[in-house]
């Protein structure tokens, strides 16, 4: 049968990772796949290590969280695809890698982070009394490619509405805890 290595992104038992894990288990059961779940504690370096270990085991497929970004994952995915391993990304897109390997099964399951951030800001403006000249605090991950597009959109939409935004970048220590 088919073997899939699947990085849930988080830690065993965390809220988001459990949802992703349960979906992967259900899909594997539906397709008759052997599933190897990996937990990276939201650490991009650990995600890369897990990917290298997965490639060494030569599964049929690997599902990654794109948090490390195209620069880090791209060459590794290139090598895996050359070995015949199908790779795909969830949660955080790898647009350059996907463009290169779409024809060999590389896809993306998740949201468009900019659209998501824009929708959130529009809803905040609709539900609150924020108006031109008011201040809002936003924290996000603008430093991280793709994931940062959500915070970027929130800031842009609020500023377009005349709201002064006080922005704080989320530290890596806080980012690894999905509860926060």
Residue ranges and their predicted role:
Residues 1-180:
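A residue-level marker of the well-folded mature domains of exported/periplasmic proteins
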């Amino acid at each position: 049968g088919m073997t899939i290595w699947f990085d849930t992104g988080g830690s065993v038992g965390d809220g988001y990772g459990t949802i992703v894990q349960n979906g992967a288990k259900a899909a594997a059961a539906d397709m008759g796949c052997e599933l190897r779940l990996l937990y990276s504690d939201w650490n991009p370096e650990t995600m890369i290590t897990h990917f290298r270990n997965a490639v060494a085991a030569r599964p049929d497929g690997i599902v990654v969280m794109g948090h490390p970004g195209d620069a880090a994952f791209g060459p590794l995915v290139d090598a895996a695809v050359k070995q015949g391993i199908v790779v795909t990304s969830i949660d955080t897109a790898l647009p350059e890698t996907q463009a290169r390997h779409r024809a060999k099964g590389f896809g993306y399951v998740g949201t468009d982070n900019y659209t998501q951030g824009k929708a959130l800001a529009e809803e905040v403006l609709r539900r609150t009394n924020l108006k031109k000249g008011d201040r809002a605090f936003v924290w996000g991950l603008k430093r991280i490619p793709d994931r940062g597009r959500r915070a970027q959109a929130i800031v842009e939409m609020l500023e377009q509405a005349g709201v002064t935004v006080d922005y704080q970048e989320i530290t890596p220590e806080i980012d690894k805890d999905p509860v926060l």
